[in-house]
């Protein structure tokens, strides 16, 4: 039995073009879709198992990446965007029509990822953004209904796809968080 991770990666991870200049994210609405422009390529693209990230129907994981917040602009139908959970660290702006999360923003200037917006690269109209490179918060899929006994198969499938599974973020991102905290303590 094939383990389904996310439609964006289930048939193999497609490598990015290496020169993606950005594009337009489009929600799933047929009438007045929300459109968001993103300048430049994405960074830290990964499969995420947390229960906060938006997942398309049938997906076990989301696919999420970051871009500088100044590179994100709502182009059309921004009146349809609403923050999903105002108490969350990442303010996820979702379309009120279809529920698609268009971008997530951190407003806390003391947060290690302040200045980066979280986006779902599979929503790009254009092809070629950087490919997912790892899987984060893998065990968290249990919280969304995956049976614990399926985790071995899920981790094996992630590895087969070239997405190293972590139960937190990747080592590079965890190092960035620890560095930020250490600098803040030293200040």
UniProtKB/Swiss-Prot annotation:
The keyword Zinc applies. One of its GO terms (molecular function) is S-(hydroxymethyl)glutathione synthase activity. Coiled coil: none annotated. Keywords: Lyase, Metal-binding, Zinc. Binds 2 Zn(2+) ions per subunit. The keyword Lyase applies. InterPro entries: CENP-V/GFA, Formald_GSH, Mss4-like_sf. Zn(2+) 2 binds at residues 48, 50, 53. It is an enzyme of class 4 (lyase). Zn(2+) 1 binds at residues 27, 29, 95, 98. Its EC number is 4.4.1.22. It catalyses: S-(hydroxymethyl)glutathione = glutathione + formaldehyde. One of its GO terms (biological process) is formaldehyde catabolic process. Residues 20-167 form the CENP-V/GFA domain. Pathway: One-carbon metabolism; formaldehyde degradation; formate from formaldehyde (glutathione route): step 1/3. Its cofactor is Zn(2+). It comes from the Bacteria. It holds the Pfam family GFA. Catalyzes the condensation of formaldehyde and glutathione to S-hydroxymethylglutathione. HAMAP family: Formald_GSH (MF_00723). PANTHER family: CENP-V_GFA DOMAIN-CONTAINING PROTEIN-RELATED, GFA DOMAIN-CONTAINING PROTEIN. Belongs to the Gfa family. This is Glutathione-dependent formaldehyde-activating enzyme. It comes from Bradyrhizobium sp. (strain BTAi1 / ATCC BAA-1182). The lineage of its organism: Bacteria, Pseudomonadati, Pseudomonadota, Alphaproteobacteria, Hyphomicrobiales.
């Amino acid at each position: 039995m094939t383990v389904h991770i996310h439609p964006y990666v289930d048939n193999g991870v497609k490598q990015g073009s290496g020169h993606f200049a950005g594009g337009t994210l489009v929600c799933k609405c047929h009438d007045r879709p929300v459109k968001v422009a993103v300048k430049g390529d994405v960074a830290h693209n990964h499969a995420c198992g947390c229960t906060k990230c938006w997942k398309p129907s049938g997906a076990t994981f989301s696919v999420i990446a970051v871009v500088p917040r100044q590179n994100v602009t709502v182009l059309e139908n921004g009146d349809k965007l609403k923050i999903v959970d105002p108490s969350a660290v990442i303010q996820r702006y979702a379309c009120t029509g279809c529920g698609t999360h268009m971008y997530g923003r951190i407003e806390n200037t003391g947060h290690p990822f302040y200045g980066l917006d979280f986006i779902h690269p599979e929503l790009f109209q254009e092809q070629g953004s950087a490919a997912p490179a790892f899987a984060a918060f893998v065990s968290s899929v249990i919280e969304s209904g995956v049976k614990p006994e399926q985790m071995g198969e899920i981790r094996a499938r992630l590895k087969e796809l070239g997405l190293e599974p972590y139960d937190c973020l990747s080592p590079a991102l965890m190092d960035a968080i620890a560095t930020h905290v250490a600098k803040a303590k030293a200040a």
